[in-house]
Protein backbone atom coordinates (compact mmCIF):
# COMPACT_ATOMS: atom_id res chain seq x y z
CA UNK A 1 0.00 0.00 0.00
CA UNK A 2 1.26 3.47 -0.90
CA UNK A 3 1.96 5.92 1.88
CA UNK A 4 0.09 9.22 1.64
CA UNK A 5 2.36 12.07 0.59
CA UNK A 6 1.52 15.70 0.07
CA UNK A 7 3.76 18.07 -1.84
CA UNK A 8 3.07 21.11 -4.00
CA UNK A 9 5.06 23.71 -5.88
CA UNK A 10 2.63 26.30 -4.50
CA UNK A 11 3.62 25.50 -0.91
CA UNK A 12 7.31 25.28 -1.82
CA UNK A 13 7.17 28.86 -3.15
CA UNK A 14 5.12 30.31 -0.26
CA UNK A 15 6.18 28.31 2.79
CA UNK A 16 4.14 30.36 5.30
CA UNK A 17 0.88 31.19 3.51
CA UNK A 18 -1.80 33.35 5.09
CA UNK A 19 -4.48 31.38 3.25
CA UNK A 20 -4.51 28.01 1.50
CA UNK A 21 -7.13 26.06 -0.37
CA UNK A 22 -6.92 22.56 -1.81
CA UNK A 23 -9.36 21.06 -4.30
CA UNK A 24 -9.18 17.49 -5.59
CA UNK A 25 -11.28 16.01 -8.37
CA UNK A 26 -11.35 12.90 -10.54
CA UNK A 27 -9.31 12.89 -13.74
CA UNK A 28 -11.75 12.14 -16.59
CA UNK A 29 -11.12 8.94 -18.55
CA UNK A 30 -10.03 10.54 -21.83
CA UNK A 31 -8.53 13.76 -20.47
CA UNK A 32 -4.88 14.70 -20.82
CA UNK A 33 -2.52 14.14 -17.91
CA UNK A 34 -0.42 17.19 -18.85
CA UNK A 35 -0.45 19.57 -15.85
CA UNK A 36 0.35 22.63 -17.99
CA UNK A 37 -2.68 21.89 -20.21
CA UNK A 38 -4.83 21.69 -17.09
CA UNK A 39 -3.38 24.99 -15.81
CA UNK A 40 -4.07 26.75 -19.13
CA UNK A 41 -7.60 25.37 -19.20
CA UNK A 42 -8.26 26.25 -15.57
CA UNK A 43 -7.33 29.91 -16.07
CA UNK A 44 -8.93 30.32 -19.50
CA UNK A 45 -11.92 32.63 -19.93
CA UNK A 46 -14.09 29.56 -20.65
CA UNK A 47 -13.42 28.10 -17.20
CA UNK A 48 -13.97 31.26 -15.19
CA UNK A 49 -17.37 32.08 -13.70
CA UNK A 50 -19.45 34.13 -16.13
CA UNK A 51 -19.30 37.32 -14.05
CA UNK A 52 -15.48 37.23 -13.91
CA UNK A 53 -15.20 36.27 -17.57
CA UNK A 54 -17.42 39.21 -18.62
CA UNK A 55 -15.37 41.61 -16.47
CA UNK A 56 -12.15 40.35 -18.06
CA UNK A 57 -13.61 40.56 -21.57
CA UNK A 58 -14.69 44.14 -20.88
CA UNK A 59 -11.17 44.93 -19.68
CA UNK A 60 -9.73 43.38 -22.85
CA UNK A 61 -11.90 45.73 -24.91
CA UNK A 62 -10.30 48.67 -23.10
CA UNK A 63 -6.79 47.53 -24.04
CA UNK A 64 -6.45 50.08 -26.84
CA UNK A 65 -7.12 52.91 -24.41
CA UNK A 66 -5.52 51.67 -21.19
CA UNK A 67 -2.92 49.19 -22.39
CA UNK A 68 -2.92 45.44 -21.75
CA UNK A 69 -3.89 44.39 -18.22
CA UNK A 70 -1.25 42.83 -16.00
CA UNK A 71 -3.26 39.66 -15.46
CA UNK A 72 -2.82 38.68 -19.13
CA UNK A 73 0.72 37.63 -18.30
CA UNK A 74 0.06 36.85 -14.63
CA UNK A 75 -1.90 33.63 -15.05
CA UNK A 76 0.56 31.81 -17.30
CA UNK A 77 2.32 28.56 -16.43
CA UNK A 78 5.64 29.55 -14.91
CA UNK A 79 7.13 26.20 -14.00
CA UNK A 80 6.43 22.49 -14.47
CA UNK A 81 8.01 19.91 -12.17
CA UNK A 82 6.98 16.29 -12.39
CA UNK A 83 3.21 16.04 -12.41
CA UNK A 84 2.53 19.64 -11.32
CA UNK A 85 2.45 23.03 -13.03
CA UNK A 86 2.82 26.30 -11.13
CA UNK A 87 1.00 29.54 -11.85
CA UNK A 88 2.49 32.44 -9.89
CA UNK A 89 1.42 36.04 -9.48
CA UNK A 90 3.10 38.71 -7.39
CA UNK A 91 0.81 41.65 -6.82
CA UNK A 92 0.84 44.86 -4.85
CA UNK A 93 -1.58 43.46 -2.25
CA UNK A 94 -0.86 39.74 -2.33
CA UNK A 95 1.34 36.97 -3.69
CA UNK A 96 -0.52 34.03 -5.21
CA UNK A 97 0.71 30.55 -6.13
CA UNK A 98 -1.50 27.89 -7.67
CA UNK A 99 -0.15 24.39 -8.17
CA UNK A 100 -2.11 22.25 -10.61
CA UNK A 101 -1.17 18.59 -10.30
CA UNK A 102 -2.30 15.53 -12.21
CA UNK A 103 -1.82 12.08 -10.66
CA UNK A 104 -2.41 9.72 -13.56
CA UNK A 105 -2.01 6.56 -11.44
CA UNK A 106 -4.69 7.62 -8.95
CA UNK A 107 -6.71 9.44 -11.67
CA UNK A 108 -6.84 12.66 -9.65
CA UNK A 109 -6.44 16.35 -10.39
CA UNK A 110 -5.44 18.61 -7.50
CA UNK A 111 -5.36 22.38 -7.29
CA UNK A 112 -3.40 23.88 -4.39
CA UNK A 113 -3.75 27.62 -3.80
CA UNK A 114 -1.40 29.49 -1.46
CA UNK A 115 -1.77 33.21 -0.75
CA UNK A 116 0.44 35.62 1.18
CA UNK A 117 -1.25 38.92 2.01
CA UNK A 118 0.74 42.14 2.15
CA UNK A 119 -0.62 44.17 5.04
CA UNK A 120 -3.22 43.64 7.77
CA UNK A 121 -5.88 45.65 5.92
CA UNK A 122 -5.74 43.19 3.02
CA UNK A 123 -6.56 40.26 5.32
CA UNK A 124 -9.70 42.05 6.52
CA UNK A 125 -11.20 42.66 3.08
CA UNK A 126 -10.19 39.22 1.82
CA UNK A 127 -12.87 37.34 3.80
CA UNK A 128 -15.47 37.42 1.00
CA UNK A 129 -12.87 36.08 -1.44
CA UNK A 130 -11.93 33.32 1.01
CA UNK A 131 -15.58 32.35 1.38
CA UNK A 132 -16.20 32.29 -2.39
CA UNK A 133 -12.95 30.63 -3.55
CA UNK A 134 -14.00 26.99 -2.87
CA UNK A 135 -17.17 27.42 -4.93
CA UNK A 136 -15.42 29.32 -7.73
CA UNK A 137 -12.62 26.74 -7.88
CA UNK A 138 -15.08 23.82 -8.03
CA UNK A 139 -16.78 25.45 -11.00
CA UNK A 140 -13.46 26.14 -12.73
CA UNK A 141 -12.33 22.54 -12.25
CA UNK A 142 -15.68 21.21 -13.49
CA UNK A 143 -15.54 23.33 -16.64
CA UNK A 144 -11.92 22.28 -17.25
CA UNK A 145 -12.87 18.62 -16.79
CA UNK A 146 -15.56 18.93 -19.46
CA UNK A 147 -13.26 20.84 -21.82
CA UNK A 148 -10.29 18.50 -21.49
CA UNK A 149 -12.30 15.27 -21.62
CA UNK A 150 -14.12 16.25 -24.81
CA UNK A 151 -17.55 15.98 -23.17
CA UNK A 152 -20.14 18.27 -24.72
CA UNK A 153 -23.25 19.56 -23.03
CA UNK A 154 -26.60 19.11 -24.72
Predicted regions and their residues:
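Short C-terminal domain-edge/linker segments immediately following a structured domain
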Residues: 54-58, 117-118, 140-147
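Intrinsic-disorder/low-complexity, polar/charged segments enriched in Ser/Thr/Lys/Arg/Asp/Glu/Gln
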Residues: 18-24, 84, 108-110
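Hydrophobic ligand-binding cavity/cleft-lining segments
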Residues: 1-61
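Hydrophobic-ligand binding "helix-grip"
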Residues: 67-105
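A conserved amphipathic terminal alpha-helix motif
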Residues: 124-154
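Residue-level marker of positions within ordered structural domains that often coincide
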Residues: 30, 43, 82, 116, ...
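Beta-strand/loop substructures that line and gate deep hydrophobic ligand-binding cavities in soluble
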Residues: 92-131
